[in-house]
Regions:
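Short cytoplasmic-facing helical segments at TM-TM junctions of multi-pass membrane proteins
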Residues: 137-180, 210
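Periplasmic/extracellular loop-to-transmembrane helix junction in inner-membrane transport proteins
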Residues: 25-72
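Transmembrane alpha-helices
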Residues: 127, 131, 164-196, 224, ...
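Alpha-helical membrane-interface segments at transmembrane helix boundaries
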Residues: 3, 57-69, 92, 99-102, ...
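Transmembrane-helix boundary motif in ABC transporter permease subunits
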Residues: 69-99
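Generic hydrophobic transmembrane alpha-helix motif, especially the helices
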Residues: 100-136, 143-144
Length: 260
């Protein structure tokens, strides 16, 4: 089999080659798709601005803070609701139907409401990001609590374990792989929520810079900003993956990635 690094390198070279060919032959308008060289120049410009502490560093730090708080709030709410749904009849019968109903809605459409409720500051972006990222955590946590086999549950019951002991020593350890799958999905969702909020609600984040560059038809700058945002998303995703491999140490490495 081809090593992963070689396959990824060949795919990247092929992608950039087709991209360069399409722009040099003017198959696509430069306004729509800039050349790799133009994009690289803007990548360098944005990178220098980030390193020297310019206005883009302030914007990137604002977006990073929003992502962090949105993910942290989603983790707290999602885990709590997941335990409620997975451990209680009330949660399963009364709360879960409402959660499913809300989850079926296009959550990005709630962005104007959060802006109207919380204003144009960072709070509305954090709330939208947490709102989008909460549901995968709820579902994965509840599913993880059901993962323990009936024999294991009966064994704990026969040994006189309390409900809390069964939860902490059996259900949570067994369900951790499921929960981390939800966290990795949430890591992607929280990025979408933050950028959508910055698109619509303005502010000083990278999303606002992308909107400004797009309005000026500065496509290379838009591509460069998006690529740096993808690095932030990858950092969050691989942080969760790293935590999974440290905490769920009994799980095989190939089972821990890319999403489960």
């Amino acid at each position: 089999t081809i090593p992963r690094w070689l396959a990824m390198t060949l795919l990247f070279i092929g992608f950039v080659g087709i991209w360069q060919l399409a722009t040099s032959m003017v198959w696509v308008s430069p306004i729509i798709l800039p050349s790799p060289g133009e994009t690289l120049n803007d990548l360098i410009f944005v990178g220098e601005n980030l390193v020297t502490g310019g206005y883009m560093l302030t914007a990137f730090w604002t977006t990073t803070q929003t992502v962090f708080w949105g993910f942290l709030i989603a983790l707290g709410i999602g885990f709590s609701l997941g335990v409620l749904v997975g451990e209680t009849k009330f949660g399963e019968r009364a709360v879960l139907p409402y959660l499913v109903a809300i989850d079926t809605m296009p959550k990005i459409a709630f962005a104007p409401l959060f802006i109207a409720w919380l204003g144009f500051g960072i709070s509305s972006k954090v709330a939208l990001a947490a709102f989008i990222a909460t549901f995968p955590i709820v579902v994965s946590t509840a599913a993880g609590l059901y993962a323990a086999s009936e024999n294991e549950r009966m064994l704990f019951k026969a040994m006189g374990a309390t409900r809390m002991q069964t939860l902490l020593r059996l259900k949570l350890p067994t369900g951790l792989p499921f929960m981390f799958t939800g966290l990795k999905i949430a890591a992607v969702g929280v990025m979408a929520g933050v950028i959508t909020g910055e698109f619509l609600g303005g502010g000083k984040g990278f999303g606002a810079l992308i909107r400004q560059s797009a309005s000026q038809m500065d496509t290379p700058r838009v591509f460069a900003l998006i690529l740096y945002l993808s690095l932030l998303g990858l950092l969050l995703y691989f942080t969760v993956l790293w935590a999974q491999r440290r905490i769920v140490f009994w799980q095989k490495e190939e089972q821990a990635g890319p999403v489960g």
